[in-house]
Regions:
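Long amphipathic alpha-helical segments
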Residues: 141-169, 230-314, 318, 322-359, ...
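Structured, contiguous alpha/beta core segments that scaffold functional sites
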Residues: 1-57, 61-65, 69-257, 264-266, ...
């Protein structure tokens, strides 16, 4: 009786080097709606999507600019000099630089904190702080807010000299002393946008670094061990040919038998990303309140700012100004009070000009002509 020859089992070579890379902004992947600790997510939103970072910068610059009027000339001169040269953090000077950093924090996190530094009975500096390192506690009455910060041992406790601290919230919700960021509602869409961009980058990387599939077709009578040895020889020659190509040397690939070479994924079309990216960006930009073309997004060849858009944007900027005006008034009044002067001041904000100057002049002319005709008719 003949024994059946035992077939030689050859281990197949499996090579799967596809990594699980995703976009580097990990906080967006772990976003939980209406959760806490969203400050890191908001920072990553600005870093990941340049349009949002540009939107915050433009809103800060558009809302900035004011003058302060005092009751007497001497107080006016001293206050103007102080506001133009007051030290801020990180080597910056002037109340405008302080207000820019304060507004940046207010728009990003929904709240901002600052401090008036008093030394020798005088107001020496005005600084803004990291609001993410602080906690807010409601006092005994709804009008009292206590700011907590870490001490030398890292424990949270109420900060001393609460009267010298500046705190502002934007659109606070009932029952919460924290404000609302303009980025709330964006992380979900931003995560989808990051996946699209990461996929686009991966596809282009593979297009520039093509992966090949080399198939050696053998007959039915080919021994498995021989087939494996032949496959290793073909793989070695193919790798050697590819390495020589990197060095600028042309090397031919010669193989015996039926060898089929294909580009992995070469027959699969790349998905069109223009429509989904535009749909997501439309919602993100709409949340900022800025016209798209101000952020470099030209979705229409004849796009321009209409009168209605200018009015809406102006109202948004004035709302931001009204939010931070009490902080500016407190700084000015504290400085004048410590100087022993009348601390009554008025904040005069600069006009927000978003329309063409020629169009505004034409509109003023039409109004003047209309008033003239009405006066003559009477």
């Amino acid at each position: 009786m003949k024994r059946k020859k035992k077939e030689q089992q050859v281990a197949s070579a499996v090579c799967q080097l596809r990594d699980g890379r995703s976009h580097p902004f990990g906080a967006l992947r772990g976003y939980v709606p209406l959760g806490t600790g969203q400050e890191r997510i908001y920072r990553e939103l600005r870093e990941a999507i340049p349009v949002l970072d540009a939107a915050v910068g433009k809103m800060v610059r558009l809302a900035d600019g004011f003058q302060v009027e005092c009751q007497n000339k001497l107080a006016q001169e001293k206050l103007d000099q102080f506001l133009s040269m007051v030290p801020c953090v990180r080597g910056q000077y002037g109340i405008n630089n302080f207000l820019s950093g304060y507004l940046d924090s207010l728009l990003t996190y929904g709240r901002a904190v600052g401090e008036m530094v008093v030394g020798g009975g005088k107001l020496r500096a005005v600084c803004w702080g990291d609001v993410t390192a602080l906690e807010i506690e409601e006092g005994e009455n709804p009008l009292e807010t206590i700011i907590w910060g870490p001490d030398e041992q890292g424990f949270m406790k109420p900060l001393p000299y609460q009267q010298l601290l500046l705190f502002t919230t934007m659109n606070p919700e009932p029952g919460s002393p924290y404000g609302v960021s303009i980025f709330r509602g964006m992380p979900f869409l931003a995560e989808i946008l990051m996946k699209i961009y990461q996929t686009i980058g991966t596809n282009w990387e593979r297009a520039g670094n093509v992966r090949y599939s080399v198939i050696c077709k053998g007959g039915n009578d080919l021994d498995p061990v021989t087939a494996q040895e032949r496959g290793k020889a073909v793989a070695a020659e193919w790798s050697r040919a590819m390495e020589e190509g990197k060095n600028g040397t042309v090397r031919d690939f010669v193989a015996v038998g039926d060898v089929e070479i294909k580009v992995i994924g070469g027959e699969n079309p790349i998905l069109d990303s223009e429509v989904p990216v535009r749909q997501i960006l439309e919602q993100l930009v709409a949340k900022t309140g800025l016209p798209p073309f101000l952020l470099g997004l030209n979705w229409s060849t004849t796009e321009r700012m209409s009168t209605q858009q200018a009015d809406i944007l102006t109202s948004e900027l004035w709302a931001i100004r009204r939010t931070v005006q009490p902080v500016v008034e407190k700084i000015c009044r504290t400085f004048l009070a410590l100087e022993g002067m009348d601390n009554r001041v008025s904040i005069i904000w600069d006009d927000i000009s978003l329309q063409d100057i020629s169009q505004e002049a034409q509109a003023d002319l039409y109004r003047a002509q209309a008033e003239k005709y009405r006066a003559e008719a009477k």
